[in-house]
Design a protein with these regions (language model features):
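Histidine/acidic residue-rich metal-binding segments in metalloenzymes
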Residues: 6-20, 36-146, 162-184
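Short beta-strand/loop segments at the ligand-binding rim of alpha/beta enzyme cores
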Residues: 20-28
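Short, ordered loop/turn segments at secondary-structure junctions
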Residues: 29-31, 58, 90, 151-152, ...
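His/Asp/Glu-enriched, well-ordered alpha-helical/loop segment
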Residues: 84, 105-116, 168-234
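Short, catalytically relevant binding-site loops at active-site mouths
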Residues: 92, 123-125, 152-155, 189-191
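Active-site clefts of carbohydrate-active enzymes
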Residues: 145, 150-158
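N-terminal beta-loop-helix "entrance" segment that forms/cooperates
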Residues: 158-160, 229
Length: 234
């Protein structure tokens, strides 16, 4: 509801100008959620103008305790339009977050296997090894893919919570050997949250490899190339 449809209209104009040079895919982001009526109105309008449905269930969980309902709305919309769904989950490096697991359950419930992509998954590393590997099995059942955005939360604040020692990154070193497709993204570019993030995919990729201690060059090439196409459905 902040920018209404102005940004996506401009984006479509840009896509038309550069259509011979690059393939552009658009997704929305529900920074104000999908529960509040005005936010829902603009979500419904915007969902007709994008190539994949994007969402942030934490917004509605924080404001209304209705994060699971928000997932239902996102997945229902994506399914009805026959497009993929990209959902930001487990962003805050906390063992209290289980959004990736919840999204797996909702993906299967809505029959959206292979059409849902989780973004971040940072808090997965804060859980026990037993939980993590049970989650990877559930991700395989849901055919869920993951987009890592390493710069987004590498500056995680110091905490007094007890959790397994790890860096605040998507655990790509565990996911990839478990058969989960991992791609790379950025969230966000030189904004007030991450002012030093330049949107450079090499910066993101090198941080992921170093931070996960995962110098598998073949896997990194896949993350930067074919896996990116998979999560975009191209």
């Amino acid at each position: 509801p902040v920018c209404e449809d102005r940004a996506i209209i401009a984006a479509h104009k840009a896509r038309e100008v550069y259509k011979h040079d690059i393939v552009l895919k658009f997704a929305n982001q529900t920074l104000k959620g999908v529960i509040e009526p005005t936010a829902r109105k603009w979500f419904d309008i915007g969902s007709e103008m994008v190539d994949m449905i994007g969402g942030l269930p934490y917004r509605d969980e924080l404001d209304y305790g209705r994060g699971l309902e928000a997932m239902d709305i996102l997945l229902d919309t994506a399914k009805s339009r026959g497009i993929m769904c990209h959902v930001h989950v487990d962003q805050f490096n906390s063992p209290t977050e289980i959004e990736t697991e919840q999204l797996c359950d909702k993906t299967i419930e809505h029959g959206m296997q292979g059409r849902v992509v989780a973004i971040h998954g940072i808090s997965i590393g804060s859980h026990s090894k037993d939980y993590r590997y049970r989650l990877y099995e559930k991700m395989r059942q849901a055919q869920m893919m993951m987009i890592a955005c390493p710069m987004a939360w590498i500056d995680s604040n110091r905490k007094e919570e007890l959790m397994p020692f790890h860096n605040a990154l998507t655990p790509a070193d565990e996911m990839i050997p478990e058969g989960i497709t991992v791609a790379i993204g950025t969230d966000n570019i030189c904004d007030y949250m991450v002012p030093l993030c330049e949107g450079d995919m090499w910066q993101e990729l090198s941080l992921l490899a170093a931070g996960c201690r995962f110098p598998d060059l073949d896997a990194m090439v896949n993350i930067a190339s074919i896996n990116g196409r998979k999560v975009l459905g191209i």
